[in-house]
């Protein structure tokens, strides 16, 4: 898992897997979840990090490898 912050876009990217993204869903304001072909979460993008408070209900359970 990787976590990156982009100063230019004020966004945090949580990369869970390198699988190809085939679908995305905005689960709450400024929170986008990306899915692979098996409907598994592969990444989470949080926008406008500095300008607002975010509560994130993750739609999945992380499993240890």
Language-model features: locations:
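Small, basic N-terminal interaction modules of short regulatory proteins
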Residues: 1-65
């Amino acid at each position: 898992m990787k976590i990156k912050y982009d100063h230019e876009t004020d966004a945090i990217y949580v990369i869970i897997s390198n699988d190809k993204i085939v679908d995305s869903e905005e689960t709450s304001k400024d929170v986008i979840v990306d899915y692979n072909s098996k409907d598994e979460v592969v990444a989470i993008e949080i926008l406008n990090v500095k300008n607002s408070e975010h509560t994130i209900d993750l739609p999945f359970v992380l499993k240890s490898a």
